[in-house]
Amino acid sequence: MAVTAALVKELRERTGAGMMECKKALVETNGDIELAIENMRKSGAAKAAKKAGNIAAEGTIMIKEGEGIAALVEVNCQTDFVAKDSNFVAFANQVTDAALASKASVEELQAQFEEARVALVAKIGENINIRRVQYVEGEALATYRHGDRIGVVVAGSADVETLKHVAMHVAASRPEFLTPDDVPAEVVAKEREVQVGIAMNEGKSKEIAEKMVEGRMKKFTGEVSLTGQPFVMEPKKTVGEILAEKGATVSAFIRLEVGEGIEKQEGLSFAEEVALAQKG
């Protein structure tokens, strides 16, 4: 069967692959488009396997909100250029829609979207990974995305505007816990040990150092907890004080940022990373 321009166009539309790749696949199968698609899918799987070792520390945080629940999903790629690609963004949206609909675990989402991920890796040429999914449930919810890289959901009993401002605060100030009382005892003990050591290095006796540290520990638990932090929009008051004034409460929050905890490859410029991603 002759390989016509119309056949190449159809294969491009069905696979999203480049024109030359489609033409080559059709020539190899004597114009059998179904066999060409099958071969291209196998080739895509091979490409995805080769890309799997590449560090994917860029990407996007997506948020989808439903009745009393919100889903946050992190999908990673290798470069911020691909993070803005319409195909990548569409994939991340599909994953997040599925997460909200089923409250699936990250492992379940990875299994559900593996075929689509492999096809996207073959098309884009970068490793892609569904890394995290988290859910927040509450009476009232507010969401905030700072660009594509930071996503926050806050749940509580308050008007949406107040919760939205708190979500913006969480994005900027990175609290680790909800209240000072929520800071785990082992975290407090470790920080106390560090602060006592600092005071003793300043020449204080251990007894005096331990007394000094009491004030520092109160400051520490405030700094790492949402309600104890100075509110970014009104720094003379804490978030807890602002909430009390409004008769509002926050029951939970989640903040995700692209690439948290991923060790990036050092020593390469962006151009070098792109060149490396394009090899093989």
Curated annotation (Swiss-Prot):
Keyword Protein biosynthesis attached: yes
Annotated stretches, region: Involved in Mg(2+) ion dislocation from EF-Tu: 79-82
A UniProt-annotated Pfam family: EF_TS
Record CDD domains: UBA_EF-Ts
Keyword Protein biosynthesis: yes
GO biological process: translational elongation
GO function terms (MF aspect): translation elongation factor activity
Cellular component, GO annotation: cytoplasm
Subcellular localization, as worded in the UniProt entry: Cytoplasm
PROSITE patterns xref list: EF_TS_1 (PS01126), EF_TS_2 (PS01127)
InterPro entries on file: EF-Ts_dimer_sf (IPR036402), Transl_elong_EFTs/EF1B (IPR001816), Transl_elong_EFTs/EF1B_dimer (IPR014039), Transl_elong_Ts_CS (IPR018101), UBA-like_sf (IPR009060)
Keywords: Cytoplasm, Elongation factor, Protein biosynthesis
Gene3D superfamilies the UniProt entry points to: 1.10.286.20, DNA helicase RuvA subunit, C-terminal domain, Elongation factor Ts, dimerisation domain
HAMAP family hit by this protein: EF_Ts
Purpose of the protein: Associates with the EF-Tu.GDP complex and induces the exchange of GDP to GTP. It remains bound to the aminoacyl-tRNA.EF-Tu.GTP complex up to the GTP hydrolysis stage on the ribosome.
UniProt similarity note: Belongs to the EF-Ts family.
Protein name: Elongation factor Ts
